[in-house]
Curated annotation (Swiss-Prot):
Its cofactor is FAD. It is an enzyme of class 1 (oxidoreductase). It comes from the Eukaryota. GO terms for molecular function: oxidoreductase activity. This is Oxidoreductase 1. It comes from Elsinoe fawcettii (Citrus scab fungus). Belongs to the MQO family. Oxidoreductase; part of the gene cluster that mediates the biosynthesis of elsinochromes, pigments consisting of at least four interconvertible tautomers (A, B, C and D) that have a core phenolic quinone to which various side chains are attached and which play an important role in fungal pathogenesis. The non-reducing polyketide synthase PKS1 was proposed to iteratively catalyze decarboxylation between acetyl-CoA and malonyl-CoA subunits for polyketide chain elongation. Keywords: FAD, Flavoprotein, Oxidoreductase. Its EC number is 1.1.-.-. Induction: Expression is up-regulated in the presence of large amounts of glucose and during nitrogen starvation, conditions highly conducive to elsinochrome accumulation.
């Protein structure tokens, strides 16, 4: 990690209790916008181990190209390098875009480990609702908490870079944890068992232990806000 990226990481990372809440790393300029990595830890039962208010420190990095663009780039090898600076191990990743009119588009991308190796297609399941982004709950627990987390992540960015019309209630992406497939649940369970055998605790140190949400930030004049969501 370069000195500049390390300084940024140190300046915006925070801890709440014993949980590492987020570690935002400014990555290389690639395509239309600067990519900002945000590493969020959630507990296994789906509850949030921190207050959503603790996400207020999130920062946008100004894009030089002033547009997120309307195409969804692939997960190439250079972008996978962000895994090495964030501690990600293996997650299913989804590119998604949210338009100002509230509609959503989602494209599945291969899940990768920190070396860029692909996991089975069976792990790739839609986790974001297509169509209108409505009905996000303000609850901070369980499935609704995950919807609210994505909602608040976008809302936290808006005062910095987004048009005023994108408010906390106007664009609400949905994260449907209930749609996570059986193979994914089995994968999670096997990781937990493996970790419990090694450590006597379910800490998931070596297998899918944290969620990584790198946000591709659009300019205020762009029609799009693009983001990636990683779900276990």
């Amino acid at each position: 990690m370069s000195g500049r990226r390390r300084r940024l990481t140190e300046s915006v990372s925070t801890r709440v209790g014993s949980y590492h809440v987020a570690d935002a790393v400014a990555l290389q300029r690639e395509g239309a916008a600067m990519v900002v990595g945000i590493d969020i830890l959630l507990t296994w039962n789906g509850s949030l181990p921190f207050s959503l208010g603790d996400l207020r420190f999130l920062h946008c990095v100004r894009s030089e190209r002033r547009s997120c663009g309307k195409s969804l780039p692939g997960m190439n090898s250079s972008r996978v390098n962000m895994a090495e600076t964030s501690g990600i191990s293996a997650f299913t990743q989804f590119w998604g875009c949210i338009r100002l009119d509230g509609s959503c588009e989602v494209t599945r991308r291969p899940a990768m480990d920190l070396h860029g190796h692909h996991y089975r297609e069976a792990y790739l399941q839609p986790a974001i609702m297509d169509g209108p982004c409505t009905g996000a709950s303000s609850s901070a627990r369980g499935r609704d908490g995950k919807k609210a987390l994505i909602h608040r992540l976008l809302a936290a960015l808006c005062p910095v870079r987004c048009p005023a019309k994108i408010s906390g209630s106007s664009v609400r992406p949905m994260l449907a944890a209930s749609r996570i497939s059986g193979p994914v649940r089995s994968f999670i369970a096997s990781c937990r068992r493996q970790d419990e055998q090694m450590n006597g605790r379910s800490q998931m140190r070596d297998c899918a232990r944290r969620a990584f949400l790198p946000l591709r930030v659009s300019d205020a004049r762009s029609e799009w806000i693009c983001f990636i969501v990683a779900i276990w």
